[in-house]
A protein has these predicted regions:
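Extracellular/periplasmic, surface-exposed regions of secreted and cell-surface proteins
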Residues: 4-23, 31, 66-122, 135-454, ...
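Acidic, glycine-rich flexible loop segments
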Residues: 35-74
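Active-site-surrounding "flap" and adjacent substrate/cofactor-binding loops of secreted or lumenal enzymes
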Residues: 131
Length: 460
């Protein structure tokens, strides 16, 4: 279901929106052989023996356990089943109010929700027997039947409100914008399972065994919130001299309450030299603009939703008087000073269009300083802390040059565009706040080194 609406209530009041609903249902009976097994199982393997038993022979010899359990024909014969339903709803509603010329007040609310419900059953299945002796082959059967139920819910809400004002005359042009936004994300999940059902016909979870060893359950929840205020002003003088100023203030629930706000200003200026009087007689230059900018951005992509919390391990048993005693261990200390990573970018650029706009050149030189980078640090073993929290201790500098050339032409009615790019970049670790060299395995066998004065992520 997909519905869109838009209506001009009055000359100055407009509403718009959309509603979407998606429902997916899956109901699968019997086995679900992995389709790849149809390609992987060799043609010389016997799928089913002449005596009715499942195949265990490949090329005159007993097949490997993986080939036997991957027999697609056998997988189709079992009594496994699974059922699931996913429902997704999205509402997007907004409005525009234009009370006076040049002034627009806008609001938008977006809600997206997704709910999943699933239930699956794994039936008993006898082991495959060898063709020659009839001996069961270990690891080829399902020895305990089981049922599991899963539920999850994801909701995301985003609200935005802005006020925009435009004013211009023959010389000046001014645009001002102010706004706020709020985002709330939440994920919840539950799961439960039982084993040892007396019959494959039972489809209720309560039909399984009540013994503790046959019961299982789990769940989880995570959420975050972001509140933002922002403003921007643009000024143009005779469409030649351009200025822009921005400011953002963002607060994230991923940080402790005293350290949640980050403030990120930015400024830019441009000069369209080709609009000047002394350029009017240079016909082969269609556009020549130089520009400069400086701005900051905040980053929380490397921050977990609860990284500033103190963590405890509830399963830390210890020995007291030769007896095991239940204990609680602090596995990670609180990290109340956790804050925003900040990127400060300085850029100098030029835009050129030549020869009736057939040739375009865009070139930029940039200096990018990233500060308060989240990095781990070494903790003395005697603290007993398993996992040290990351801290905002890193500084990295990147410098580089980028240029793109585009040529547009035609041969008769055939039009073509050719684009070429060149880019260089140099970076180094500027500061680790006195921390020792940091060695990371990058999730594999290759190790990387973070050392002051060296390129970030050098091979170690």
């Amino acid at each position: 279901l997909d519905t869109n609406i838009a209506s001009d209530i009055t000359k100055w009041f407009t509403v718009k929106g959309s509603i979407k609903y998606i429902r997916n249902v899956s109901d699968t009976e019997h086995g679900q052989p992995w389709m790849g097994n149809f390609l992987l199982v060799p043609s010389i393997m016997v799928a089913q023996q002449s005596n009715g038993e499942w195949g265990s022979i490949a090329g005159g010899k007993q097949a490997t356990q993986s080939f036997i359990t991957g027999n697609p024909l056998r997988a189709l014969s079992n009594k496994n089943w699974s059922k699931s339903k996913t429902e997704e709803t999205m509402y997007d509603l907004g409005f525009d109010i234009k009370p006076v010329k040049g002034l627009v007040i806008s609001g938008q609310g977006v809600f997206r929700g997704q709910e999943y419900k699933g239930k699956s059953y794994t039936a008993l299945q006898d082991e495959v027997k060898t063709f020659e002796t009839g001996t069961p082959i270990g690891g080829t059967g399902t020895y305990t039947n089981s049922m599991s139920m899963n539920w999850s819910s994801v909701t995301r809400m985003l609200y935005t409100g802005t006020i925009k004002y435009d004013w211009s005359n023959s010389i000046h042009n001014i645009t001002a914008l102010a706004g706020t936004s709020y985002e709330h994300y939440k994920y919840e999940a539950l799961s439960a399972g039982r084993k040892n059902f007396p019959s494959d016909a039972l489809e209720d979870l309560n039909g399984g065994s009540n013994a503790g060893k046959d019961l299982s359950n789990g769940g989880g929840m995570t959420e975050y919130k972001i509140l933002s205020y922002f403003g921007r002003i643009n000024y143009s003088l005779m469409d030649r001299y351009l200025l822009e100023a921005n400011i953002r203030a963002d607060a994230s629930s991923r940080f402790y309450k005293d350290n949640r706000w980050g403030y990120f200003p930015s400024f830019s200026a441009g000069w369209r030299i080709s609009q000047e009087e002394f350029m009017k007689n240079i016909s082969w230059i269609n556009n020549l603009k130089i520009r400069a900018s400086w701005g900051t951005l905040g980053n929380i992509n490397n921050v977990g939703n609860y990284d500033y919390f103190q963590n405890y391990n509830l399963g830390s048993d210890y020995n007291f008087n030769d007896e095991a005693v239940k204990g609680i261990l602090e596995s990670k200390p609180a990290n109340l000073g956790l804050g925003w990573e900040t990127v400060a970018l300085t850029d100098f650029g030029v835009d050129i269009d030549l020869f009736d706009n057939k040739l375009s050149i865009v070139a930029d030189y940039y200096i990018k300083n990233t500060s308060d980078i989240l990095l781990g640090y070494n903790v003395p073993v005697e603290t007993g802390i398993w996992s040290a929290p990351s801290q905002n201790i890193g500084k990295v500098k990147n410098t580089g040059f980028e240029m793109a050339l585009t040529y547009r032409g035609n041969v008769g009615d055939l039009k073509y565009t050719v684009t070429g790019n060149i880019a260089t970049n140099k970076n180094k670790v500027v500061d680790l706040a006195g921390s020792d060299d940091i060695i990371s395995n990058g999730g594999g066998k290759i190790r990387f080194l973070f050392r002051e004065g060296e390129t970030i992520g050098s091979f170690y």
